């Protein structure tokens, strides 16, 4: 069971919080609780029905994100003097139980990030470092044979980090998100792997700003080739598309008194190389980088993920 969402995806939220004090515009345009790119190689374990009755996996993530571009309609277009840097360390614990639900095995996971945010915007800067928002989920895994596993979950992200609408940098988005999730890992051949995870976010209101971010469709993907028994190389990335408009005070978001015609809907596609190494028979480490393209109403930059996974049974 690989992670299916950590609450790290704050890189836009911290930037947008700046504008509450700088020009009284929308404070959260395009923010999400997804963490695009979290999942890469082997999103799900193969043959889950063959795993021990009480199976655990400890995952430790490191994430680095940096952006120098921000073009967003609620700020009138391109924003000058932008530099957004985010670093996160995210422990996550997975559990797979012997209980059966709808023909699959029931499990769950919980993730708690620790974040450091640095934001420079409109000539001002801020930095914050603390615990971030907590994510947890029940999940069901279906064993479809030795080469295919399917999964479904309901992720919940709670606003447990630090938030101040007058600060540029925050480690919380200050709203709850519910995310139905579907994931898959498939081995088309002995040496190839394809993994996919899709979520759909239902964001609740940030009561500090009376702002509600729109619903978001998102997926992570991975395609890899196993060079040796323990080493794989591949491509990874993510796609995110906001499907409904942002609202503030229950109304269309405005800029300079005029309604924003695109609803401040965010979009991004990212792709890049990845490496996966297995060691001590069942443990693994991976590193993945992705460059963002086709960005709308979000920062545009580069994303780096590193991950260590250690499975164990009790």
Regions found by a protein language model. Give the residues of each.
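Cleavable N-terminal export/targeting peptides
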Residues: 1-38, 313-314
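Short loop/turn motifs that connect adjacent beta-strands in outer-membrane beta-barrel proteins
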Residues: 28, 46-55, 97-107, 121, ...
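Surface-exposed strand-loop-strand hairpins of Gram-negative outer-membrane beta-barrel proteins
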Residues: 28-36, 64-88, 122-127, 168-169
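Transmembrane beta-barrel strands of outer-membrane/channel proteins
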Residues: 34-35, 58-64, 108-114, 152-158, ...
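Residues on the lipid-exposed face of transmembrane beta-strands in outer-membrane beta-barrel proteins
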Residues: 48, 60, 91-95, 136-142, ...
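Residues that define the transmembrane beta-barrel architecture of outer-membrane proteins
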Residues: 54, 83-91, 128-134, 172-178, ...
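Outer membrane beta-barrel transmembrane domains
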Residues: 67-71, 75-77, 210-314
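Outer-membrane pore/translocation modules
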Residues: 107-108, 113-206, 212, 258, ...
